Amino acid sequence: MSTRIITEPTVEPLVLADVKVHLREDLTSASNDALITTLIQVARQEAEHRLQRALMLQTLEQTLDAFPVATDTNPLAAIVLEMPPVVDVTSVTYTDAAGSTIVLSNTLYTLDAAREPAQLVPSYAAGSWPATQGSVAAVRVRYRAGYSTSAAAATAQAAVPSAIRQWMLLAVGDMYERRAAS
């Protein structure tokens, strides 16, 4: 099982002007804006890696070699979505036994996004997951994750917990101070 980013976030949890104030940088000078913007992105990526959480809205794809089967420890044959908080599932595709790529109807699975990490289970109507071809990455689940579904930057940024944003400010400050001399 692996997860990769399909669509990167379009907004970062920190505002450039706020970071410049934190760094005691001149707000009217743009000389270091590109560097600081890059450091903000790096801090978000590091926070996401450490926390195993998507901070800003992004599209992810999780691959599995087959659908899970019901067991004593996984009675619902749940697929655990690795990067919370999950907003929604955009598609589930799989390679069937004949080698054809099939898009699974959203009526055949149920997302339990209230649980963390979120789980995807076969719907009651489906009963179980379909059979797949015995191949690597035969199942692909695309989903959106992040603290906010808002396209408005201020709303999305405010949805990220303040402790995470504060850690990011400190991380950006540390990287900024330790950068190589130009």
Predicted regions and their residues:
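Divalent metal-cofactor coordination and adjacent catalytic microenvironments
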Residues: 1-182
